[in-house]
């Protein structure tokens, strides 16, 4: 789990953090090659989000070998720059080959980066008399 998440984290952080360590109580730390361990809480928001994505993706891949379960992600790119967002989309597309990926996001830029998606758009239309929910599905 640590090795697989470390590879993904290294890719998402452009090689800045390449190793993940989990102690006996599963407390995570990250490190650069040959550098000291850094608690995840000390990372920037973007690096922390990248770490948690890498860990969830690694766990989903390990579990998929036994029983594929959907991977549900809620706005994983909130603190990502465009390059890191593109890297994450690439990982999601790789994961989607073996398991169902459900991504909840308000970031419309992701739609321009994915090759294939089923989009469920939920919004609100208001009129003077009532408020109704509208749902659009796009392939």
Where do the language-model regions lie?
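Terminal ABC-like ATPase head and other globular end-domains that cap long coiled-coil arms
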Residues: 1-139
